[in-house]
Amino acid sequence: ARPHQPREEALAQYEEWGASGVKYGFMKGNPQEKNRKTQEITRLCAKHHLMVDYHDYPVHPFGQMRTWPNAVTREYCKAQLDGRQIFQPKTFVTSAFVNMVAGPIDQNNGFLELHQGRTTRKDNNQEVPSTVTGEIARTLITWSGATVIPDIPEYYRKYPALLEFLSAEKQPWQESITLAGEIGEYIVMARRNKD
């Protein structure tokens, strides 16, 4: 959208272009103002047949999944690289128990280059405290209506089998069971899709 273009005009244009949805974020205002704006944008996106993923913190859950199924996910958590900070494994495992209680979250899991200084983000020279398979497993554990992976395409092309695995994930899950876990320590889940 052009700067200062009215929201509804921009969303109507995306619908006309055949877009599936938008990733909306970086809203200004206090939490109450942001949540009011979130509800308005969710309604407008539904009107224009667009899914919406909120890339903003915090977008509080307000029952949107039931009323507005086009609101597929939101960043009601600390996501990877928030404030240029890679989160620790303990943060992930805590979010899996706490933040997902109210619905899907956009946490941006799935790094395949574990030293972020070598990516296009030269300003972030941190190691990702994980493994490649651990990052892929996080995409299964995190319930999200739209899995958003954060790395650059070249790194996914280096692991074609993992990219194929990510592409085959079918959400929403038909069945999800937490087999074992402790907040902040570990989680073991089983997921089943319709197939």
Where are these regions (language model features)?
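Carbohydrate-binding surface patches
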Residues: 182-195
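Aromatic- and carboxylate-enriched substrate-binding clefts and catalytic-loop regions
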Residues: 1-131
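Catalytic cores of secreted or luminal carbohydrate-active enzymes
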Residues: 133-182
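Short amphipathic alpha-helical patches
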Residues: 68-69, 164-165, 189
